[in-house]
Amino acid sequence: MKLPVSSPFEDYVKPLPAGDRAALADFFSGFDSHCILAKAEKRKLREDFEKVILYYVNLNLSLGRALELLDPANLGGFYARPAVLWFPLDDAAKIYPLSMKPGSMSVFRLSVYLKEPVVPELLQMALDFTIRRFPSFATTLKKGFFWHYLDTAKRRFTVSRESDIPCRPLKVSQSGSPAFRVLYWDRRISVEFFHVLTDGTGGMVFLKALTEEYLRLKGIDACVDKGPWALGETPSPEEFENAFARIEQSSSSSGFVERAALQMSGRLSENRPCRVLHFRMDAAGLHEAAKKYRATVTVYLLALMFMAGKAATDQMKGEQSIQVPVNMRKFYPSKTVRNFSLYCGIRLPIEKIGDMEAMTGEISRQLESKGSKEAMNRMLTGTERLVNSLRFVPLAVKQPAARLIYGFLGDKIFTNTLSNMGVVQLPDRMAKEIEAMDFVLGTAISNRASCSLVTVNNTAMFSIAKLTADPSFEEKLYELLKRDGVEVKVEGSELYES
């Protein structure tokens, strides 16, 4: 007969003085009052607390201080109430589940690089505490008769050690499966989101809140509970609204049909992405390079991408087109962490790609025109009219047609993408703990490169998610940056090829 084996936490508790055991009993009584999860999920959540208590004890932190940092009140009422909320998809999100195919899903990734290795137990605890502040993320994707929707999932959301290709599809078809994942590797914390949940702005709010909570558990005051997304605040409806619905329709609408754009010529990989590269640059140096052409950083990088794209294609005629997301919050201030972005396409004939002064001028003109409030309103009106026309079409009929339309319109009309998150603002004490950030877009169906940029602490990280092993695009981009005096440190993965 096998005797039951005690856990490391039970071994720790047995020799404690009666006062400490009583304090732990009171602590876990408080935990019980904050958690009504199913038995298995509750056990996992309790074990998260036990592991962090042991971590603190091994650091010679007093039990009293450990229990103070881990106060079950940080769970709020999230785990103590049954699931009742559900969220209709916002206007931009509705296409994403319709267009899913095996191995293909609109996923993006945000990462923060700390100055010390990540402690997995603390990151898991930080997620346990943070998720209650983001009820629209604590959901699972479900099918309605006409549309998909997000249904609240009361569960313990899991942190995992990174072991796979970035931006792999999430298994949202499984019951209760989340539409995001939290990963760690060495000093990096990453969150990957299915675009049905949020856009880059909303994702960054979540990553910052998660990182702040992680640092608090590390004993670092990173200004938690002092901003609008303090974990102790009660979520408000405007933080999870479909902000598109507040915008009045334009008198005219813009269509979605564009001419097919030139594609880079490298052979498509079976792995999506087949490689992720990061160009780490001094943000001030990058800004100075752009100023030489009287351009913004976005315009400057778009010009370089057009030149690199020309070097990566065998086509001699036609147009390149780069998709540029447009954050609607700059036109309509909103607290929402759901999708509130549209896009425009910057197009240049391949024969006019070459002269930087001419290109930056034309790109600036197109960005100002196509990315304007009026142009975005026309696109939104067109989107809403399309959505309304499909409103009462059963989901089973909509999905096959949407896959076909998305595959043609969403991919063939662009050569690649540039999404610039801009400069991320952090509290000073938090910024001191962070070395850099990165932002990675999942690959499209046939676009060979998806590019993104995020800047923090004067470090600009330009990321390229590749869909071909052909290195022509990134090699030309590197050459052009060096030509303009920008120091570039290339980081990233090897080829994910068998």
Positions of the model-derived regions?
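Non-catalytic, low-complexity flexible loops and terminal extensions
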Residues: 2, 11, 42-63, 188, ...
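A secondary-structure boundary/capping signal
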Residues: 114, 192-193
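Hydrophobic (often cysteine-bearing) scaffold residues that line and stabilize catalytic clefts
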Residues: 119, 199-203, 297-298
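General beta-strand recognition
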Residues: 188-190, 461
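Alpha-helical hinge/cap motifs
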Residues: 195, 290-298
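Short amphipathic alpha-helical segments
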Residues: 297-306
